[in-house]
Swiss-Prot record:
Belongs to the DOT6 family. Keywords: Cytoplasm, DNA-binding, Nucleus, Phosphoprotein. The modification Phosphoserine is found at residues 280, 333, 341, 366. This is Transcriptional regulatory protein TOD6. The keyword Isomerase does not apply. Component of the RPD3C(L) complex composed of at least ASH1, CTI6, DEP1, DOT6, PHO23, RPD3, RXT2, RXT3, SAP30, SDS3, SIN3, TOD6; UME1 and UME6. It comes from Saccharomyces cerevisiae (strain ATCC 204508 / S288c) (Baker's yeast). It is found in: Cytoplasm; Nucleus.
Length: 525
C-alpha cells in the first residue's frame, strides 16, 4: 500500500511542483486568464506576422499604380527632355499637333499645343528649355533618339520624312518665290505667327549676316513673327524684304529682275487710279511706309483730289450764269402779249395787263430799254421756273422740221405728236412738237400770204368763235387805234412798229398761235 502512496506522493509532488511552477508563473502573471489570453495573442501574432507585411506591400503597389494611372490620365509635369522633344517636332519637323501627340503617350494635341505656347510666350521663366536654340541641338537630339521605341520613329525615318515634306512643300505650294539677289527665303512656314523658319532658311540668313553681329535674344515671342519672320537677324531691311516677298507674289513672279532699291519702295498699298469727270488721268504713286518723300506725294494726291472736287464750284457758276439767258429767249418766243387783239386780251387780262409783265415779256423790246431787273427777278421767279421746264436743250434741226412738214402735208400717214416724239431723236415733248408745228404752219402762211389771201381769210373766219365774231369784228383802223391806246397806257417805246401792223390778216395770223399759248399758261398756272 505504501507504493501507491508514494506514487500519489510523487504525483502530488509533481502536482506541487506543477503548482509551484504555477505559483512562479502566477508571481509573474497574477491572473491566470490573462496568461492564457496572452499566450493565445502571442501565438496568433506569430502566425499572422507574415501576411500583414504582404498586405502592406500590396497596398503600396496599388497606390503606386493609381498614381501612375492618374499621371497617365492627367499628366501635369513636363520634363525638360519632353520640352526639347516637343520643340524639335514642332519647330524643325513642322509636324501637326495630332502627329506630335502620338510621340507623347497619354497627352492630347491640345495639351501639346498649350505647352508649346507657354514655352514660346516666355511665361516659364524658370524653365531654360525655352531659351535653348533647337537648331544647335538637332544633331545631339538625333543621336540621342537613335534607338527607336515603340511609339516614336527612328532618326533616319524622321530625316526621310523631313526630306519628303520639304519636297512636297517646294513642289506643290507657292511659298518659294523670286526675290532680290541679296535675300532668298526658301520655304514659307504654314503659320507665320506660330512657327520658326526651317533650318535651311536660318542657315541662309546666317550666311548673309555679318559675323560681328550677334542676336540680342535667342528667343522671340510669337507676336513678332507676324511682322518679321527672321529670328536671328536684327537688320530691319531683311525683315521688310521678307514681308514684301511673302505678300507681293504676283509682282515678284512677273518681274524677276527687280532691283533691291525698288523693293525698298514697294508698299502694301495698292495702286489707285483716279479719273476725274474731265477725263484727267492722275496715277497715284506707290506709298512706302517710312519716307517723308512719300508723305509729300500722298499729300499731293489728296490735294489733286480736292482740286478735282473743287471744280464743281466753277461748273455751278457756269450753269448759274447761263441759266437766265435761255428762259428769257424762250419766253420771248412763247409770250406774245402785245400782238393780241382786244378780243383775246379780254380773256387773259389777269396774266398780261401788268406793266412789269409788259416790259419783261415784250419780245421786240430793244436792248437800250431800261427795266428794273430786281423787280423782274422778284415778280417773275415763278414764271422763270415754269418756263425753264420748256427750255429745250437741243435746237431744232432741218431734219426735224422736214419731218414735221411732211407730217402736215401727208394726210394719209398723219402721225400724232406722241408718235412724232418717238420718231425724233432728242426726246421732245408733245407740247414742244405742237408749238413747232404751229410755228412752221405760221411761217408757211406768211410766206404764201400774197398768193392765197382770200382763201386764208375765209378759213380763219371759220376758225374764230361766233362770240368773237359778234363782239369783236373791227376794221383795221379801229384795231390800230386800240393798239395805239394799249401802247400809250404801257409806255411802250416801240409804238411805231406796232402801229404799222394795220392789216386784219396779220392780226388774225397772230391769233392762230393763241390756243397753243393759252394751253401753255394753263399748264404753268
Amino acid at each position: 500500500m505504501t507504493l501507491p502512496k508514494l506514487s500519489s506522493v510523487s504525483v502530488s509532488s509533481g502536482h506541487v511542483s506543477a503548482n509551484s511552477h504555477g505559483f512562479s508563473i502566477l508571481s509573474k502573471h497574477p491572473h491566470p486568464n490573462n496568461l492564457v489570453h496572452s499566450h493565445s495573442l502571442s501565438h496568433t501574432n506569430a502566425k499572422s506576422h507574415l501576411p500583414i507585411s504582404s498586405t502592406s506591400t500590396k497596398e503600396n503597389s496599388t497606390n503606386k499604380e493609381e498614381a501612375e494611372s492618374l499621371k497617365k490620365n492627367n499628366p501635369s509635369s513636363w520634363d525638360p527632355s519632353d520640352d526639347i522633344k516637343l520643340r524639335h517636332l514642332k519647330e524643325i519637323k513642322n509636324l501637326g499637333w495630332k502627329e506630335i501627340a502620338h510621340h507623347f503617350p497619354n497627352r492630347t494635341p491640345n495639351a501639346c499645343q498649350f505647352r508649346w505656347r507657354r514655352l514660346k510666350s516666355g511665361n516659364l521663366k524658370s524653365n531654360k528649355t525655352a531659351v535653348i536654340d533647337i537648331n544647335k541641338l538637332f544633331g545631339v537630339y538625333a543621336t540621342g533618339d537613335a534607338t527607336p521605341s515603340a511609339g516614336t520613329p527612328s532618326a533616319e525615318e524622321a530625316v526621310k520624312e523631313e526630306a519628303v515634306e520639304d519636297e512636297d512643300i517646294t513642289a506643290g505650294s507657292s511659298a518659294i518665290e523670286d526675290s532680290p539677289p541679296d535675300f532668298k527665303p526658301l520655304v514659307k512656314p504654314k503659320y507665320m505667327d506660330r512657327k520658326l523658319i526651317t533650318q535651311r532658311s536660318t542657315s541662309t540668313f546666317s550666311d548673309h549676316e555679318p559675323q560681328h553681329t550677334k542676336p540680342r535674344k535667342l528667343f522671340v515671342k510669337p507676336r513678332s513673327f507676324s511682322h518679321s519672320i527672321t529670328t536671328n537677324t536684327p537688320n530691319v531691311k531683311t525683315a521688310q524684304q521678307t514681308n514684301l516677298s511673302l505678300y507681293n507674289t504676283t509682282s515678284a513672279k512677273t518681274n524677276k529682275a527687280v532691283n533691291s532699291n525698288d523693293y525698298e519702295n514697294i508698299g502694301l498699298v495698292p495702286k489707285i487710279i483716279i479719273r476725274s469727270r474731265r477725263n484727267s488721268f492722275i496715277p497715284s504713286t506707290q506709298i512706302p511706309h517710312s519716307t517723308t518723300k512719300t508723305r509729300k506725294n500722298s499729300h499731293s494726291v489728296i490735294s489733286s483730289r480736292r482740286s478735282s472736287f473743287n471744280m464743281m464750284h466753277s461748273r455751278r457758276s457756269s450753269f448759274n450764269s447761263h441759266a437766265p439767258t435761255e428762259p428769257i429767249s424762250r419766253r420771248a418766243s412763247l409770250v406774245v402779249s402785245p400782238y393780241m387783239s382786244p378780243r383775246r386780251l379780254s380773256t387773259s387780262q389777269s396774266v398780261h395787263y401788268h406793266p412789269q409783265h409788259q416790259y419783261y415779256l415784250n419780245p421786240i423790246a430793244s436792248p437800250n430799254c431800261k427795266t428794273d431787273h430786281a423787280n423782274d427777278k422778284i415778280t417773275h421767279t415763278r414764271t422763270f421756273l415754269d418756263m425753264q421746264k420748256f427750255a429745250n436743250k437741243h435746237p431744232w434741226s432741218r431734219e426735224d422740221d422736214e419731218v414735221l412738214l411732211n407730217n402736215t402735208k401727208d394726210k394719209q400717214n398723219h402721225l400724232s405728236p406722241l408718235e412724232i416724239s418717238i420718231v425724233l431723236p432728242n426726246n421732245r415733248s408733245e407740247l414742244e412738237i405742237q408749238q413747232r408745228m404751229d410755228y412752221l404752219k405760221r411761217k408757211g402762211r406768211v410766206s404764201g400770204f400774197h398768193t392765197n389771201e382770200g382763201c386764208k381769210d375765209e378759213e380763219e373766219e371759220d376758225d374764230i368763235d361766233p362770240l368773237h365774231k359778234e363782239n369783236g369784228i373791227n376794221t383795221p383802223s379801229q384795231q390800230s387805234q386800240n393798239y395805239g391806246m394799249l401802247e400809250a397806257k404801257h409806255d411802250n417805246p416801240k409804238s411805231s412798229e406796232l402801229s404799222s401792223m394795220t392789216s386784219a390778216n396779220d392780226i388774225r395770223n397772230e391769233q392762230d398761235e393763241l390756243p397753243g399759248i393759252n394751253s401753255i399758261f394753263k399748264n404753268i398756272f
